[in-house]
Amino acid sequence: MFSTSNTLLYADKLTDFNMPMPHIYACHLSDQLIQFTGPDKKSYLHGQITQDVNLLTNDALLWAGQCDAKGKLWSILRLFNFQDDYFAITSKDEIENALAEFKKYAVFAKVDIEQNKNHQLVGLFGDDLSAVLSELEIILPTENNSTIDFKFGKAIKLDNNRLILCIDKKAQLPSCITLLESEQKWQSLSILAGEPKLNNQAIAEYVPQMVNLQAIGGISFKKGCYKGQETVARMKFLGKNKRAMYILEANTNKPFEATEVEQQLGENWRRAGKLIQTSFDIDTNRAYALAIMPNDLALDTLLRTKQENPISIEIKPLPYSLIEE
């Protein structure tokens, strides 16, 4: 378990998004934690997910997918190791199914799987994080998607401008941070980074490659068997996958209300795909989304939301390549 004998200083909350933003700010994340303990945790988890758990060192952050027998995703996970236990970060929409599926066969192994409710996940972001890193005594690794232990828990580096802090719920943040009451800005940054996350409607709908999990190192094609492996392998080696996840952006004064997007074909509009995550930045009047659409869709395709008053959408380039080696 985490050791938190000391607590951090209190941070004032910023409730008005139109106020000037500081260089360093944070928000409490709605993402949830699953904790794996026991002598069989590695072998058990290894047989449940798309990732090679042998790669889960103390300083690694690994993406993974948890599939059903047909290869459809129950959840998308980010795994890290701390004090001999494994932790998986997943969304508030995915946690219930993920936990139930992980526990289904745990009775046959020496492993305990529980939702960890004693700790909080805090998204920390800004142009220059050096001041808060110094105050927290965190020396970040140079690599993205890496982790480091520090005196209050675990620091997870996503990139040079974004961290996740996993700390005790009683711990607070340094006074140099402004704590936002909404995670919308964090969610927008996650979407622009092309980081997949499922909403309720997307659970058990897509295979891992449809949410670009292979492009961010979330699938091992060399490991042993796991639930759904046959479908995942067939998608890769037989070229069966026809969909991918795209980043969408719109100039609008309100959030996306639709769950689907349409593309223009001549004078008509046809269904193009579904939204799996959305966010809205009230400061810039920009809405963002992740959508699952055909993987041969051109970046200049005309898109709009499927709703009574459609919103025009543009496709943003992904920050990583979908071309497999």
Regions found by a protein language model. Give the residues of each.
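Glycine-rich, small/acidic residue-mixed loop/short-helix segments
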Residues: V211-I219, A233-E325
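Acidic, proline/glycine-enriched N-terminal capping motif
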Residues: M1-I76, F80
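Short, conserved charged micro-motifs
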Residues: D40-L45, I95-L99, L129-L133, K170-I177, ...
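Residue-level signal for inorganic ion chemistry
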Residues: G38, A88, G126, G228, ...
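Acidic, low-complexity central loop/insert segments
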Residues: H23-H28, Q32-L33, R78-A193
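Glycine-centered loop/turn motifs
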Residues: D59-A60, L136-I148, K254-E262, D300
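Short amphipathic beta-strand starts and helix->beta connectors
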Residues: L14-M21, W63-I76, K104-V107, N145-G153, ...
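Anionic-ligand-binding alpha/beta catalytic cores of soluble enzymes and soluble regulatory domains
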Residues: C166-E249
